[in-house]
């Protein structure tokens, strides 16, 4: 007698256009093809609903190369049935999001920002029953480049839509939330701190059967008010799984896809071209760790300093791999391509320069970046701090970080040199 397999909801989050199987400090990301193969294997075992908890279309090399367009089209090849908008889907503006959301081929949800005009919920019918999804984008307006108007009462939004889904026939309701647990990487390794996120979910968690978390690049499997929560590793490194069976408590766990090959879906030619453009070689591997040290980010800072001809430079570098071992970004020894540099820094890369006093420069050099998923790279001709120095940084968050550290405004001026151009010069 065959065993009836439960319905599984399988989700990724913060995939960030990680379509190439990029190297990491611990091995490799699976890439888009690896994810597709993992889903085929799961479907052979029984019915699944494929979900995504946001930031699938940006950031990443493919997103930057295509002006924010190809990340939406490529997602159509990942077998996703339903997803929620992450803050980075807003990176090119609300109108851009509205225009390209249909290219994904799946319902892209956004219940707590109704002005965006995307559906708040979706029903997925399977031969095991009907699953209702409510999508909640990140409730923190500070994380957006172009923030939508966010409903301040997340509880009312989630509870109301969960009730509507059940009235419409949903036997289970799953919340896709673009927010997640805080974390720290210390002497004991990776430590999740779910307290803040639990407070976000506590008023409404009872109204849903399960929650997929995301956004913070961390990992956690736990419960809020008895409701199971799964936040797998980001970048497709893991698939979060919630097993649903009528009359049974949901079961939660994660699975690890194997590494796939070159991406053959939408945007594959753009990625192949960028991968074929070799900028130079590294004699030794380089990486940056959460909390430091960050020699890879320091290397980017050195490239910016040399390209702009200033005395010092600083670079903020976000994670491009899960912090499984504390490493946030990694380049192996050997050839470095344009795609590699874009993977490490896919953001707008205009740089600015301004004057700081010697003591101020020392403070900037040792100013910790406020989030564990980013590092602060620094390089200077002379760190002794004698006299006034010109400091180059990335426009935006890095410039603001310097001003917060110094407690004053800096008279910034554009350098005319992009960070990726600077890195290309030092590599060549």
Tell what function each PLM region has.
Residues 1-260, 295-303, 351:
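Acidic, metal/ion-coordinating pockets
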Residues 12, 17-29, 142-147, 153, ...:
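Catalytic centers of hydrolytic enzymes
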């Amino acid at each position: 007698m065959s065993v009836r397999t439960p319905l599984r909801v399988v989700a990724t989050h913060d995939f960030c256009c990680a379509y190439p199987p990029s190297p990491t400090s611990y091995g490799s990301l699976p890439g888009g093809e690896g994810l597709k193969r993992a889903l085929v294997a799961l479907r052979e075992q029984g019915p699944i609903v494929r979900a995504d908890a946001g930031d699938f279309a940006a950031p990443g090399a493919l997103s930057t190369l295509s002006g924010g367009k190809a990340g939406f089209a490529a997602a159509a090849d990942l077998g996703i049935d339903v997803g929620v908008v992450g803050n980075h889907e807003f990176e090119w503006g609300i109108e851009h999001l509205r225009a390209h959301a249909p290219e994904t081929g799946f319902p892209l949800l956004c219940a707590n920002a109704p002005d965006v005009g995307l559906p708040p919920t979706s029903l997925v019918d399977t031969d095991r029953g009907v699953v209702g999804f409510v999508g909640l984008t990140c409730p923190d307006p500070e994380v957006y480049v172009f923030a939508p108007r966010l409903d301040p009462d997340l509880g009312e939004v989630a509870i109301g839509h969960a009730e509507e889904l059940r009235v419409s026939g949903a036997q289970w309701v799953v919340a896709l939330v673009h927010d997640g647990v805080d974390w720290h990487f210390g002497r004991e390794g990776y430590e999740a701190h779910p307290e803040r996120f639990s407070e976000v979910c506590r008023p409404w968690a009872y109204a849903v059967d399960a929650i997929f978390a995301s956004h913070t690049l961390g990992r956690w499997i736990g419960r809020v008010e008895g409701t199971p929560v799964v936040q797998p590793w980001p970048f497709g490194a893991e698939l979060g799984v919630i097993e649903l069976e009528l009359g049974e408590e949901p079961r939660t766990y994660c699975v690890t896809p194997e590494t796939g090959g070159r991406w053959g879906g939408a945007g594959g030619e753009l990625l192949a071209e960028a991968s074929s453009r070799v900028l130079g070689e590294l004699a030794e591997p380089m990486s940056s760790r959460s909390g430091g040290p960050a020699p890879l980010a320091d290397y980017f800072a050195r490239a910016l300093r040399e390209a702009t001809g200033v005395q010092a430079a600083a670079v903020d570098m976000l994670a491009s791999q899960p912090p499984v071992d504390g490493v946030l970004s990694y380049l192996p020894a050997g050839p470095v391509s344009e795609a590699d540099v874009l993977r490490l820094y896919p953001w707008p890369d205009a740089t600015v320069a301004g004057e700081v006093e010697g003591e101020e420069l020392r403070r900037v050099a040792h100013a910790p970046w406020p989030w564990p998923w980013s590092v602060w790279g620094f390089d200077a001709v002379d760190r002794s701090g004698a006299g006034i120095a010109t400091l180059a940084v990335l426009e935006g968050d890095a410039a603001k970080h310097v001003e917060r550290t110094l407690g004053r405004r800096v008279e910034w001026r554009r350098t005319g040199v992009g960070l990726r151009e600077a890195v290309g010069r030092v590599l060549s």
